[in-house]
């Protein structure tokens, strides 16, 4: 096999549909658009969600709730993840979590949650802790410090 023998796989490349090239082609005259009407016109067609003048679903359904502009979004880390990624006796800070690739960015702070087992002793510095995380960290002799 040489470079000039290479061909695309069977059915991988479809020929372009040439419309408006005479009635013998099967796609002549109206070019597959039917007769007159909005969809036959250039640039014609309706926007997504338009239901022909009937009240659209998005407007029939009621509005609910609001967006709390004061909501804080925390980067969440479980104690089980800390167990896997850090050595015994490590001081874990938000910077260390970013460095090790556990979190991408701090957002409004880091919150440590208590999912998973913990057998190593850590000093964890974070913005928030769940009660179960504090209990697990302290049970193995570590420290949970709020920054």
Swiss-Prot record:
Organism: Thermoanaerobacter pseudethanolicus (strain ATCC 33223 / 39E) (Clostridium thermohydrosulfuricum)
GO molecular function, one term: structural constituent of ribosome
Domain of life of the source: Bacteria
Protein name: Large ribosomal subunit protein uL15
Function: Binds to the 23S rRNA.
Quaternary structure and partners: Part of the 50S ribosomal subunit.
Protein family per UniProt: Belongs to the universal ribosomal protein uL15 family.
Stretch list, region Disordered: 1-58
Leader sequence segment: none
UniProt entry keywords in alphabetical sequence: Ribonucleoprotein, Ribosomal protein, RNA-binding, rRNA-binding
Biased composition (Gly residues): 21-35, 42-52
One GO term (biological process): translation
Record's compositionally biased regions (Basic and acidic residues): 1-13
Gene: rplO
């Amino acid at each position: 096999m040489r470079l000039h023998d290479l061909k695309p796989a069977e059915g991988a490349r479809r020929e372009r549909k040439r419309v408006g090239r005479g009635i013998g082609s099967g796609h002549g005259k109206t070019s597959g658009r039917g007769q007159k009407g909005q969809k036959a016109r250039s640039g014609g067609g309706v926007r997504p969600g338009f239901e022909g003048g009937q009240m659209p679903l998005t407007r029939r359904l009621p509005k609910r709730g609001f967006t709390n502009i004061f909501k804080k979004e925390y980067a969440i880390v479980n104690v089980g993840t800390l167990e896997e990624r850090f050595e015994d006796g490590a001081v874990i800070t938000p910077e260390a979590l970013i460095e090790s690739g556990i979190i991408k960015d701090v957002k409004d702070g880091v919150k440590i949650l208590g999912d998973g087992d913990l057998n190593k002793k850590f000093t964890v510095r974070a913005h928030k802790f769940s009660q179960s995380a504090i209990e697990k960290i302290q049970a193995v002799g570590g420290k949970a410090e709020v920054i």
